[in-house]
Amino acid sequence: MGDTVVEPAPLKPTSEPTSGPPGNNGGSLLSVITEGVGELSVIDPEVAQKACQEVLEKVKLLHGGVAVSSRGTPLELVNGDGVDSEIRCLDDPPAQIREEEDEMGAAVASGTAKGARRRRQNNSAKQSWLLRLFESKLFDISMAISYLYNSKEPGVQAYIGNRLFCFRNEDVDFYLPQLLNMYIHMDEDVGDAIKPYIVHRCRQSINFSLQCALLLGAYSSDMHISTQRHSRGTKLRKLILSDELKPAHRKRELPSLSPAPDTGLSPSKRTHQRSKSDATASISLSSNLKRTASNPKVENEDEELSSSTESIDNSFSSPVRLAPEREFIKSLMAIGKRLATLPTKEQKTQRLISELSLLNHKLPARVWLPTAGFDHHVVRVPHTQAVVLNSKDKAPYLIYVEVLECENFDTTSVPARIPENRIRSTRSVENLPECGITHEQRAGSFSTVPNYDNDDEAWSVDDIGELQVELPEVHTNSCDNISQFSVDSITSQESKEPVFIAAGDIRRRLSEQLAHTPTAFKRDPEDPSAVALKEPWQEKVRRIREGSPYGHLPNWRLLSVIVKCGDDLRQELLAFQVLKQLQSIWEQERVPLWIKPYKILVISADSGMIEPVVNAVSIHQVKKQSQLSLLDYFLQEHGSYTTEAFLSAQRNFVQSCAGYCLVCYLLQVKDRHNGNILLDAEGHIIHIDFGFILSSSPRNLGFETSAFKLTTEFVDVMGGLDGDMFNYYKMLMLQGLIAARKHMDKVVQIVEIMQQGSQLPCFHGSSTIRNLKERFHMSMTEEQLQLLVEQMVDGSMRSITTKLYDGFQYLTNGIM
């Protein structure tokens, strides 16, 4: 989960090479890549250089050529046959090299000494040119992935595999699906180049290990079952899921065994009977560690404190470190499958709340939410806030998750459990000792009770099923309603001088706030998610924090996630990568287009998690709840045409609409009904659900033939066909397309690599990649592109198929 940069470590070959020609070495220098799980070996650039020379020597001997020696350069990469380069470069070679190739063509064919000499000179020039590219600042992770995929030279692949260690972790993580897909479906040389980096990162990060294990399983599922069982991807996945890649010599923080002030957390005072996974690590603050069935290491109730400490230390390393998290995810998926069997939304919602209440009995634990970007432990799921989302056949659901941020997930102790009826103290943080928690104790609360996941069955679904449904009651007492710091109290404490504010300013601001306060949605039994999604995120965080027993802690955070069962999110992940790349391109080219890529976690070929877009509801929900047109809703939410709030929201709408129109055109996104288009509180639109892209469409009906969805309601919000904002929209479309085609290779390679060995419907047909490239219109002038944009906008506005598809969705699913 960290963002540190791993520098490549020097590696000594297993045997010292001789001083003779590379071809005379006893063994392949590429064997320095270790296949085992012992100490990780990294390919040194010097070794990669010699490996390249070895490959060259073998090919030269087959063609009757002469080996090229290293002329003092740190690394010389060469082509395979001396004539046609097998290394695909991003740009054409310099003109001088091209001229030399033309001049020496006949000489090389005749095999004369002069031709051979020129060939060696040409190879040296090519090597020097490629080396300069690899060592330049322009050589980024995108180029590295491109060379790794396209090159047929084992030496080049080995060098790129070593260079992965030089890039930032987050840059490589973006291409993790591509790296693992190449590892699964491409030849052994590519896999050998990638594996050292993957193994090294798995040792460093438990979250990276989980991501790799999940993706390896999902992308191996397209293989035949007999092949899949013995594939490299399956073997690497088993290695990651075992405990062999656990970081060496790393110990977790031990729970404090010294006497501490009464925190209300000792086992004798708990009102809830923990499962046996909790008993594994339960510690009485007034006695020694007690023997339990799931802790065989403890042999005597009267052991000394030192032996108790040793036993706990040993128990930390006993379970497989990914097991609790995998069981946590499995529990969430099992809930979704059970919900899908219920007929009505109301029944699904009630069952969801009950299931999550049971799940809370297992928390806190050494589990985390993989969609988050920081280290944390999950401590509680506010079950009454969960909602079932709209779906005709399945039951995706949205949950909110309370976590405590920590410096290091592996080494920080799991937070102590605080019973539901011990909600935070009132008025201010200074009053917390009234609830039994001092300031010092609060800072060290992570070490009060050890982690509860030391049992292999810490997150077994069967164990959850044995628990009784126990909906906690929230008592209103002096500890219930923490801290409503009034403005008066803050002012009196912090401000030494009076602050004078003009009464007119106060009246004006209050009137604007009243006029532009976002409206709340009414509760709809058929769509319970509308109310939850409409509530402002900050208000939701404040409300949940006030009702949480962990809310007083300074490192408390609230996260949210959508759990989906029965849906293949691999296409969603591909779309996320393309959107993220386009977003980066437009930022780099300073084109003010706005899109919102949301994180995707692929769990298997038919399940996953999605990061929700906060402060956003679907256009379908907007129209159903408000019974207004889109323009009238904007006026209701943001004020009249001339207010700053409306103009800002209108600009946001235009910039996001232009961005997503280009995304929909380039990726051929289908199923664009109003349930799959969100509108946020600032006026942006956000497209969701990229299940139909490129070569696939819903039920292959072929309804949506326009380049993108642009309705008359969208144009009305922009100010009409003659408005300045509509012209601004078309200008942004043109600028965005020009910027995107400058970086076409970065976008195309994301899709092209994932097509390797894939059975996803978006890759059906042999022309998927060719058609994608054609949509960038590389041969068109800017004037021709402008005409193309005008035609696409006009065609999309007048598209009868868009209206037909919206009508079809209304009749079949009730989507407005």
From Swiss-Prot:
Modified residues (Phosphoserine): 258, 266, 275, 277, 284, 294, 428, 511
Substrates-to-products reaction catalysed: a 1,2-diacyl-sn-glycero-3-phospho-(1D-myo-inositol) + ATP = a 1,2-diacyl-sn-glycero-3-phospho-(1D-myo-inositol 4-phosphate) + ADP + H(+)
Gene Ontology terms, MF aspect: 1-phosphatidylinositol 4-kinase activity; 14-3-3 protein binding; ATP binding
Region (Activation loop): 687-711
Ranges for domain PIK helical: 29-242
Consequence the record notes for mutating residue 43 to A: Loss of interaction with ACBD3
Region called Interaction with ACBD3, residue ranges: 41-67
PROSITE patterns xrefs: PI3_4_KINASE_1 (PS00915), PI3_4_KINASE_2 (PS00916), PI3_4_KINASE_3 (PS50290), PIK_HELICAL (PS51545)
Annotated phenotype, changing residue 44 to A: Loss of interaction with ACBD3
Annotated localization: Endomembrane system; Mitochondrion outer membrane; Rough endoplasmic reticulum membrane; Golgi apparatus
SUPFAM superfamilies, alphabetized: Protein kinase-like (PK-like)
Residue positions, PTM N-acetylglycine: 2
PTM annotation (Phosphothreonine): residues: 263, 438, 517, 519
Tissue specificity field: Widely expressed with highest levels in heart, skeletal muscle, pancreas, testis and ovary. Weakly expressed in liver. Expressed in the innear ear in the epithelium of the spinal organ of corti.
Disease: Deafness, autosomal dominant, 87: A form of non-syndromic, sensorineural hearing loss. Sensorineural hearing loss results from damage to the neural receptors of the inner ear, the nerve pathways to the brain, or the area of the brain that receives sound information. DFNA87 is characterized by prelingual, profound sensorineural hearing loss with inner ear anomalies, including cochlear maldevelopment, absence of the osseous spiral lamina, and/or an enlarged vestibular aqueduct.
Functional note: Phosphorylates phosphatidylinositol (PI) in the first committed step in the production of the second messenger inositol-1,4,5,-trisphosphate (PIP). May regulate Golgi disintegration/reorganization during mitosis, possibly via its phosphorylation. Involved in Golgi-to-plasma membrane trafficking. May play an important role in the inner ear development.
Name of the protein this chain belongs to: Phosphatidylinositol 4-kinase beta
Source organism phylogeny: Eukaryota, Metazoa, Chordata, Craniata, Vertebrata
Gene designation: PI4KB
